């Protein structure tokens, strides 16, 4: 089995792409809930920063809060489409746009405990920052070494998620302008953070860019009742899911079932849309 590799976990909005200073037209819902692909614009220096981190041997994993889904402003399909637009702006080979991206995977927390209009998303989910769920899932699914990993984000809750996941606090960097009540940023932007990461650690163990297919998580939760309460039913659903994955060529990394929900991790760029979540 391949040895675990280090990662740089990246917040999305105002770390990789513009958000806070976008015009009102960019946000049909709440300001900050970016789910229109046409408004995705990289911040200065981001492409070169991602390329240098990738060349140094780091997996690049987006961990982002997208509660617009819970608030009813958009769907997981919209979030995935926005991620696709971001991936397209970060090609592994600039001479061949449309090919593999520098981004290995994108994880999104779509729940909100108090603002959700969708009952099944009105929870304080372990993927919500500053909880570490997204990072821990990525480490498990992508075979990542958290002890050698970094996190870069623009908010304290980003940093908190990294620390809660067990990352060295010195490797959890806040970037961006000063924020009221927050400590000073560690670096002005991702470009500066990337220079620091490569300088301080000498990068990972790889010397070439490694491209993997993004892993995504699809969750289906019953609104009423416990349709999977019967163990036989759960076994039948699990067998059917694995058979469908095998027939369609989708790599099913893991499958978890309980009495009300199914959670599948797929090595597929856009599984959420395929599952109709």
Indicate where each model-derived feature is located:
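Short catalytic/metal-binding and nucleic-acid-binding patches
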Residues: 206-277
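Active-site neighborhood of HAD-like aspartate-dependent phosphohydrolases
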Residues: 1-61
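Hydrophobic beta-strand scaffold residues
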Residues: 60, 169-172, 252
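A short, N-terminal amphipathic alpha-helix
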Residues: 43-57, 85-95, 245-246
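Short, basic/glycine-rich phosphate-binding loops at helix/coil junctions
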Residues: 20-30, 61, 107-120, 214-223
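Asp-based, Mg2+/Mn2+-dependent phosphohydrolase catalytic module
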Residues: 2-4, 8, 77-80, 84-104, ...
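Short, solvent-exposed loop/turn segments at secondary-structure junctions
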Residues: 68-73, 159, 265
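Short beta-strand segments at enzyme active-site cores
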Residues: 59-65, 104-109, 255, 264
